[in-house]
Amino acid sequence: MAAEQEVPIVIEGGKLVDGTGKPPVENAAVLIEGNRFKTISRKGQFPYPKNAQVISAGGKTLLPGLWDTHVHYRDWMAEIFLAHGVTTILDLGNPSTWILAQRDGVAKGKIRAPRIFACGDPIGEGHGKRGDVKGAGEAHALAKKLLGEGVDAVKVWAHCTADMLKVVAEEAHAAGRKVIGHLGVLTARDAVLNGLDCLAHATGLPMSAVKDSEKAQWMLNQEIKRLQTMIIGEPGITAWGLFAMMEEDTFDQVADFLVSRHVRIEPDFVYRWQLASRRREEREYEDFITFSDPRLSYIPPVTLTRNMRAWQVYRRLNEQQLTELNEGYEKFQKFLHRFVRAGGEVDIGTDTSEGRMPGKGVHREFEFLVDAGFSPKDIIVWATKGSAEFLGKGDELGTVEAGKIADVIVVNGDPLADIRALGKIDTVIKNGEIVDIGYHPDYVNPIPRPYEPSLHSYPVPKIARIAPAMAVEGSKPVALAIEGEGFVRGSVVHFGGVRVRTTCTSGKELQAEIPAHLLSRVGTYTVLVANPGPVNIKDPLHEDERSNPKYFMVTFN
């Protein structure tokens, strides 16, 4: 354990970028005793303990350990985060009992992983997942329960209404906790007026950046519709278009309002705008190489499929969609500059989840921000000091300063000159201990995450009934209605083992056309529904991506 470590550590000779925003210290020397920074100075300016382990950092840069403030943690992610220099994460949605057990296991030194702060269940109405509540009363009760369990912040999700958010925020703020929101049914302005502290993905912003109230309501209705019909694995095309509709002459007023309320924005370029990157093809190839690494064989297939499919989406975009993507991207960058110039604080989050690679996203977010015109110095402060201060941990974490917990990384090169140097990790020290940053194919988390359907894979379909369930031999084509759940665009009906034309009318209904040649022989035919991959198939009660069977009979004429 870090507190029991007897050998002090000295890192000497590199450039120190301490995370405070102050000018870097050349030829620095940093002394770590136990799990704390003891002395921060220059090489040769103080005596080293005789038994110190000395790490030479000549030509390298020392920085605080990095943060990712938007993660949906999975049990296999730990060492990948650490290998990318991410020493602290904020989890914004997981089963509360499991993520708090992970947090506490890491804090006790029992799990080799980044430090975890957690929100537990996200609070919202009608989304059918953990944290699904009805009305302000249930929302308040859940917030109180989560805070009683010791969560570090509270997350509200897309279907959280104004009344619900107000009582959740009051409860959270009374406990000294922040409220973070992935908005859907609320504009950013309405959410902030009801107590929101941070806009995850900058959600709700477009509707607040137009002057006409009817236009804003139309945009909000489009977002609600998108949420209701969203197929996980498909791009948020309409969302790009909403950002493209923002009116630039509103930007100063909106930015000033958010800053006056001390609201942060998490841009999350890697979540919404990755297809707008000029490094798109380079990153696609990089992902391919990463997933080919045999040391990472424990990464679930859903993550591989989700990542690689996301890049392929770009090749299918039509002209209108490309216009929405590019115009929305440009306007969002302009707004973010107005926001920062007005004094706004930016959170560095990636929405890392079962469908996205841990660690790598943080470095891509840095590159996005530099491409957008922000300075590496500011970005580093946002990803370290700013993150710690947002959670009220600034006295202990976030910077390389004497007395603080010793989270520090050493990178090859100078990220102030080239932000990509942040990805060239040489050494990671977390809580005063040198971290093994290698990958190990036998990595196992001692507390595996309980199975539950993923937001980043398709559901397992289930058939409740079919109609009709019978035809006579030699019939004309039959229009087969299938009711159930877990249906998505891309669901396919199999009739007697043969794929047939299928239309998804909703998540609970499919229409299939059974051609006449399949009705030419008497018999009992199996009807199944198969969803496209990746599908949640880890449930031991369900072995593949197909539904339960129903039966269709063809009788004698």
Residue ranges and their predicted role:
Residues 78-98, 113-123, 147-160, 169, ...:
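Divalent metal-dependent hydrolysis catalytic cores, especially in the metallo-beta-lactamase
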Residues 431-464:
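Extracellular/periplasmic ectodomains of large secreted or surface enzymes and adhesion receptors
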